[in-house]
C-alpha cells in the first residue's frame, strides 16, 4: 500500500536522487547530476502555484509527480512538469496509482484540466494514454536553439 505526502522543500534532495536514478536510465538515458536535478526541482518548487506529491511504499520513496497551476480565462490548468517512479518500482501499476491519487487531489483543488509533455513513441506515451491522456490535435511543441 502506498502512502503519500505533499512535497516540501525538505524533500527535494531525496527527490533529486530518485530523479537522477530514474532519468539517467533507459528509455531516457539522460546525464543528470544531483546538483542539476536539485536545481530543476527547486526552481519548480519555488513557483507560486507549485504542487506535488511523493509516494512511499513501506517508507521507501518510490515516486513523485509535480508541477504548477496556471490561470486561463476559462479555468485553471495544471501543468505536470515531472512525474517519475523509481526504476525498481516500475511496471507493477504504481505509476497509475500515484497518478490517480494526484488527480483526485487536483480535483479537490477545483482543477479540471491537466497537461504535460512526454517523449513520443515510448513507454511514457503509452502510460499517459492508458491513464486517460490524449494528444492535443490543436497544439504543437516548438523549439529553437539560440
Identify the residue ranges that each predicted region occupies.
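A conserved beta-turn-beta hairpin within the catalytic core of GNAT-like acetyltransferases
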Residues: 70-80, 90, 136-138
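Conserved active-site tyrosine of GNAT-family acetyltransferases
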Residues: 19, 128-129, 133
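Conserved beta-strand-loop-alpha-helix junction that forms the acyl-donor binding cleft
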Residues: 115-125, 143-146
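Conserved acetyl-CoA-binding loop-helix of GNAT-fold acetyltransferases
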Residues: 85, 91-104, 130
Amino acid at each position: 500500500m502506498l502512502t503519500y505526502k505533499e512535497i516540501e522543500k525538505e524533500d527535494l534532495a531525496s527527490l533529486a536522487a530518485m530523479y537522477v536514478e530514474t532519468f539517467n536510465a533507459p528509455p531516457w538515458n539522460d546525464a543528470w547530476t544531483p546538483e542539476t536535478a536539485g536545481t530543476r526541482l527547486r526552481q519548480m518548487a519555488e513557483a507560486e502555484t507549485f504542487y506535488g506529491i511523493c509516494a512511499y511504499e513501506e517508507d521507501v520513496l518510490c515516486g513523485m509527480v509535480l508541477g504548477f497551476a496556471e490561470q486561463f480565462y476559462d479555468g485553471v490548468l495544471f501543468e505536470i512538469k515531472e512525474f517519475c517512479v523509481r526504476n525498481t518500482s516500475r511496471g507493477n501499476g504504481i505509476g497509475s496509482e500515484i497518478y490517480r491519487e494526484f488527480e483526485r487531489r487536483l480535483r479537490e483543488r477545483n482543477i479540471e484540466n491537466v497537461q504535460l509533455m512526454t517523449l513520443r513513441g515510448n513507454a511514457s506515451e503509452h502510460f499517459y494514454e492508458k491513464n486517460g491522456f490524449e494528444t492535443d490535435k490543436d497544439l504543437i511543441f516548438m523549439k529553437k536553439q539560440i
